[in-house]
A protein has these predicted regions:
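Aromatic side chains
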Residues: 29, 51, 70, 80, ...
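Basic/aromatic recognition patch in beta-strand/loop cores that engages polyanionic ligands
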Residues: 69-92
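Compact soluble domain cores
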Residues: 6-75
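Short linear sequence elements within intrinsically disordered, low-complexity coil regions
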Residues: 35, 56, 75, 85, ...
Length: 121
């Protein structure tokens, strides 16, 4: 379990693991199972490496300029980019958990915030 006090709900966070915890998890998100490859092609993200880099960049970003966010009691960082409809979740210690474009956009973010979100540091 990660110390949620070491994670910023709204500020910038630095990820020690700059990507998914391993190649299999990255591959599972990009091209196997629930594939996100097709979701990101319109954004010009056409490789799993670009997808992974975008996820880390979003998760390390502070809130503002269309980016909303929170942390969880388990020390995960969640960010939602309203302009691009990207929802990402990850652990600064263990890496990216997921990034995708929710079908219902900001409503998905709001539901997740209500379920698990902590907005203060």
């Amino acid at each position: 379990k990660i110390n949620s006090k070491a994670v910023s709900a709204k500020g910038a966070n630095t990820f020690k693991v700059k990507g998914f915890p391993n190649k299999q998890k990255l591959n599972n998100h990009w091209q196997n199972g629930r594939t996100h490859a097709a979701e990101y092609a319109p954004d010009g993200i056409t490789t799993k490496e670009q997808y992974e880099k975008r996820a880390v960049q979003l998760l390390e970003s502070p809130c503002g300029n269309g980016i909303k966010g929170y942390k969880t009691k388990d020390g995960l960082v969640c960010r939602y980019d309203a302009k691009k409809n990207d929802f990402a979740k990850g652990s600064p210690e263990k890496g990216v958990r997921t990034m995708f474009k929710p079908d219902d956009g900001e409503d998905y973010y709001k539901r997740q915030l209500e379920l698990e979100g902590i907005e203060d540091d």
